[in-house]
Structure formats: C-alpha cells, structure tokens
Curated annotation (Swiss-Prot):
This is Formamidopyrimidine-DNA glycosylase. The active site is at P2 (schiff-base intermediate with dna), E3 (proton donor), K60 (proton donor), R270 (proton donor). The keyword Zinc-finger applies. The gene is mutM. One of its GO terms (molecular function) is zinc ion binding. Binds 1 zinc ion per subunit. It comes from Nostoc punctiforme (strain ATCC 29133 / PCC 73102). Its EC number is 3.2.2.23, 4.2.99.18. Monomer. It catalyses: Hydrolysis of DNA containing ring-opened 7-methylguanine residues, releasing 2,6-diamino-4-hydroxy-5-(N-methyl)formamidopyrimidine; 2'-deoxyribonucleotide-(2'-deoxyribose 5'-phosphate)-2'-deoxyribonucleotide-DNA = a 3'-end 2'-deoxyribonucleotide-(2,3-dehydro-2,3-deoxyribose 5'-phosphate)-DNA + a 5'-end 5'-phospho-2'-deoxyribonucleoside-DNA + H(+). DNA binds at H97, R116, R161.
Length: 291
C-alpha cells in the first residue's frame, strides 16, 4: 500500500500538473470506486467546471480543493493497495484497470488505475464538512511533519499499550501515514526490535523513534517513494527508495551496518524486517551505529 512518502510524491506531482486547471468532465468505469455521492451522475456533475485550487495530503489521503465562481468543494482520493493517479494524454490507450477518468483541457486527463479495486474517490459538496463524508479523516493521528507530532505527543499515544511497537505504528490513530515499509525502517534507525511492547519503551527511545520516523520519511520523499509492486508517480515513474532501504524487503540479505542477515517475522499478520544485532528490546545503545 502506498504510504506517506508515496502519497506525498503524488501530491507534489498533481500540484505541478493540475493546479488551476478546470475539470471539463469525467467518466466512471467502475461505480464502486466512487464512495460518495452514491450516484455516479451526481459525482460527475459535481466535479465538472471546477478548477483545482490545490492538493493537500492528510495521512494517506489526497484532498483536492475545487473552486468554481460560486463555491468550494472537495475531491478526496485514497489509493489503498494498488491505486495510481496518472496524468496522460487522452489518446493514450486505456489500461484495463482504469476505474475513473477526469478530463481537463488540451486533451489531458487524470486517470485512476486500480488493479485490486480497493481505492476510493469522494466528492464533498459545497458547505459540507469534509470529515462528515470522508469519515476516516476524523480518526487520523497527527502527521509526522506537523508541529503537533512531538516526543510528548508520541509518548502519550504509546503509553500503557501492551502491544508490539511495530503493530502500534501501523495504527493510523497513533501516527498518520505510516505503514509497513517505514515502520520497519524507523524501528531499525532507532535500534528497537519490532516485538518490543509499547509499555516497555523509555522516553529516550520514543525520542529516537520520533526522529527516525521523520528522517526515513524525508529520505523516501526525496527518492520519490518506494516501488516494490504497483506504486508509480503521476508521470508513471517508479520510486527509488527501495534501493537504499535499511531492512524492508531485504530478508536474508546482509545488514548495511553490521553484515548480519536481515530477519523477517510475522506480527499481527504483517511481515516485519529487522536486524537482531542492531536492534534490541532496549534499543538505545545501538542507535549511534546508524548515524
């Protein structure tokens, strides 16, 4: 699933390509992709003749502010497992997994391509609170790049939780936008084993973890995100972070720090990658080796 860096990469690309451009029409090829409104015709009518004022990101959600002479509405997108937003000329052949097409001037269009069909798109009418339609937004924790994401904030989210830190980091009510890839990477950078219980973490470890989360996300955004399966940016280009990942998807390969084989285990049904030499239950003493 695309995580914060991949969604941020898409947001930046959309702002470069679609800003101030008017949506001239739309075509929905798979009705269930449209989460709201329930009428596909109402969705197409709602977005037509609206210009893209800007694209925002909240966690893994993309939100386009749509402006018309009389009102402001919103377009929401969640890529889920395999969703892609691709900026293409209208003459480009349709991919068989194309679900929604948004038409713009100069024969350009924005296509939502989604192999697994889990992705969703919303149109929020003028005067309606975005969170009342895209209800997942109200459950999101602070964004890692927001001022709210302090050591104290993260500590308050983790304290008294008797579950593994890796599992907690995947909870969008703990950290918005983090997923399997960057949870593994941040835990390696902070020297903490994924099975460590949240309740056992010291404040110093949480401080290191917060810093590591921000660092790995920034590094991945600079690399254009990670492509292990389906992710592409709006121009159809792969992300490059996978080539420099510390542990994710590297089971059996030598650790980039100590040379020991990277291990993989299952936690709450998800794969977790780590180095048993560089990561410990306490974690703090190993941190300096990755700076």
């Amino acid at each position: 699933m695309p995580e914060l860096p991949e969604v941020e990469t898409v947001r930046k690309g959309l702002n470069q390509l679609t800003l101030n451009q008017e949506i001239t029409g739309g075509d929905v090829l798979l009705n269930r992709t449209i989460a709201y409104p329930f009428s596909v015709g109402e969705f197409v009518d709602g977005i037509e003749k609206n210009a893209i004022a800007t694209w925002h990101r909240r966690g893994k959600y993309l939100l386009a502010e749509l402006s018309s002479p009389c009102s402001t509405s919103w377009l929401g997108v969640h890529l889920r497992m395999t969703g892609q937003l691709l900026w293409l000329h209208r003459d480009e052949p349709l991919h068989k997994h194309t679900r929604v097409r948004l038409f713009f001037g100069d024969q350009q269009e924005l296509r939502f391509v989604d192999q697994r069909t889990f992705g969703k798109i919303w149109w929020v009418p003028p005067g309606v609170a975005v969170e009342s339609i895209i209800t997942g937004l109200a459950k999101l924790a602070a964004d890692p790049f927001s001022p709210e994401f302090s050591v104290e904030y993260l500590a308050s989210k983790l304290k008294n939780r008797r579950r593994p830190i890796k599992t907690a980091l995947l909870d969008q009510s703990v950290v918005a936008g983090l997923g399997n890839i960057y949870a593994d990477e941040a835990l390696f950078k902070s020297g903490i084993l994924p099975e460590t219980l949240c309740i056992d973490l010291q404040l110093k470890q949480i401080e290191l973890l917060r810093t590591a989360i921000i660092q790995v996300l920034e590094t991945s955004i600079e690399a254009g995100g990670t492509t292990f399966s389906n992710f592409l940016n709006v121009k159809g280009t792969n992300g490059n972070y996978g080539g420099v990942a510390w542990v994710y998807n590297r089971a059996g390969e030598p650790c980039r720090v100590c040379g020991m084989p990277i291990q993989r285990i299952r936690l709450a049904g998800r794969s977790s990658h780590f180095c048993s030499e560089c990561q410990t239950l306490r974690g703090v003493e190993n941190r300096e080796r990755r700076d």
